[in-house]
Curated annotation (Swiss-Prot):
Gene3D superfamilies on file: Galactose-binding domain-like
Signal peptide start-end: none
Species per Swiss-Prot/TrEMBL record: Mus musculus (Mouse)
Listed GO biological process terms: allantoin catabolic process
Pfam family, one: Allantoicase
Gene Ontology molecular function: any one: allantoicase activity
Protein name: Probable inactive allantoicase
Family of the protein in this entry: Belongs to the allantoicase family.
Cross-referenced InterPro entries: Allantoicase (IPR005164), Allantoicase_dom (IPR015908), Galactose-bd-like_sf (IPR008979)
Function text: The function of this enzyme is unclear as allantoicase activity is not known to exist in mammals.
Organismal lineage: Eukaryota, Metazoa, Chordata, Craniata, Vertebrata
Length: 414
């Protein structure tokens, strides 16, 4: 167990807990099977909210628990469950949270994974339904056998689960794999409870199967976009901006602290832009190099803390160049960013759809930087366009059709 799961050079200096939870119910994660759900169903594992404790609440089966808890095993074997990831992708790290399970937590666990096609998963596993107080039937065991989950690859070998504080017992595990996964199997030995299972990673899209006539969000975290640098994330990480679906609340966005270098009395230019010395920024590696044709900036829920203005720039970097930029906190004066969106005034609690009209948009980029002034929050950032490896796109201003190809030294999904 570790308190701060910071990653090293091999995984590009990222804190994996700031990545998307690929198994969460809010992105489509689904429990396919569990050996036993007596005290608490396995669906609790993939809830998006943190576990809670209700001291005086009981069910007809025992103490109410906010997690997956099996009965005390009195037959041979151990308990396990199978989860279909809501977003298929590369797993960077796993958090097995046993908060509030003092006296009942599973003492050991392991995690396996598989990359299954739709044909592989077309088994006759029946719908789960209401599971509390039940165990898997012989028919359900027979149906799940078709997945051959016992032979899946191990991401985490059998490991001891350790209790920490009653309300914060996280067990973090790094995953060193570049494979794409669609399903995971959580084994607990021999029985017990787990509050939450977080499977952190980045999505990975099948770009070859993409409809090349429609623009796609090239920075979406579900496809592999990721934040690789930022100036401030006091109230919310920039990765929230490229999350799945519509923002759910003010917590589901990027928000900075108030800048302390704000002038005592604010002044504005004729076009309404504040005259302030400072700004905040966040840099993203696109899910795939490409050409950006439309920019969407949503300030929903940011009513009294919306930035006054923003701009978006793009550039093209190799893997080594990106690592050099990270080491220098994205402050290398010699590096040239190209404008994708000039300084634009933002309106609170509103979605801004902005078509870029500059010739620079015909350049392929791998990274994008959003800069807000002076500070504040943004709920969603969408950079829509065409992937470089497959796009045949009609650029603006009636230029000839251009075909782009991926250069050596670039990575589409990391």
């Amino acid at each position: 167990m570790t308190d701060t799961p910071k990653e090293g050079k091999l995984t590009r200096f990222l804190d994996f807990t700031q990545l998307i939870d690929l198994a969460s119910e809010c992105v489509g994660g689904k429990v396919l099977f569990a050996t036993d759900d007596f005290f608490g169903p396995a669906e609790n594992l993939i809830k998006s909210d943190s576990p809670t404790f209700k001291e005086h609440e009981y069910t007809e089966f025992g103490k109410w628990v906010d997690g997956w808890e099996t009965r005390r095993k009195r037959i041979p074997g151990h308990d396990w469950c199978v989860i279909q990831l809501g977003i298929q992708g590369i797993i960077r790290g796993i958090d097995v949270d046993i908060s509030y399970f003092s006296g009942n937590h599973a003492p050991r666990m392991s995690i396996q994974a598989a990359n299954l096609s739709e044909e592989d998963t077309m088994s006759n596993i029946p719908p789960r339904g209401v599971r509390m107080g039940t165990a898997a039937t012989p028919e359900e065991f027979e149906a799940v056998t078709e997945l051959k989950s016992h032979s899946w690859d191990y991401l985490v070998p059998m490991s001891e689960l350790k209790l920490g504080d009653p309300d914060s017992s996280h067990n973090y595990y790094f995953v060193n794999s570049q494979q794409r996964w669609t399903h995971i199997r959580l084994n607990i030995f021999p029985d017990g409870g787990v509050a939450r299972l977080r499977v952190y990673g980045t999505g990975q899209r099948d770009w070859a199967a993409l409809d090349s006539t429609e623009p796609v969000d090239l920075v979406a975290i579900a496809f592999g976009g990721v934040c690789v640098g930022f100036s401030n994330a006091h109230f919310g990480h920039p990765n929230n901006m490229i999350g799945v679906g519509e923002p759910k609340s003010i917590a589901d966005g990027w928000e900075t602290a108030r800048r302390l270098d704000r002038p005592p009395v604010l002044e504005a230019s004729e076009n309404g832009l504040l005259l302030v010395p400072g700004c905040e920024w966040a840099v993203f590696r696109l899910a795939h190099p490409g050409v950006i044709t439309q920019i969407e900036i949503d300030t929903k829920y940011f009513k009294g803390n919306c930035p006054n203005s923003c701009k978006v720039d793009g550039c093209i970097l190799t893997t080594l160049e990106e690592e050099d930029m990270i080491r220098h906190n994205w402050n290398l004066p010699a590096h040239k960013w190209k404008s994708l969106l000039p300084v634009t005034k933002l309106i609170p609690n509103q979605n801004h759809l902005l078509d870029s009209l500059t010739l620079e948009l015909q350049d392929v980029i791998t990274h994008a930087m959003i800069t807000i002034a002076p500070d504040g929050g943004v709920s969603r950032l969408r950079l829509k366009g065409f992937p470089s490896s497959i796009c045949l796109l009609r650029p603006l201003r009636e230029k000839p059709l251009l075909r782009f190809s991926l250069k050596t030294g670039f990575r589409a999904n990391l």
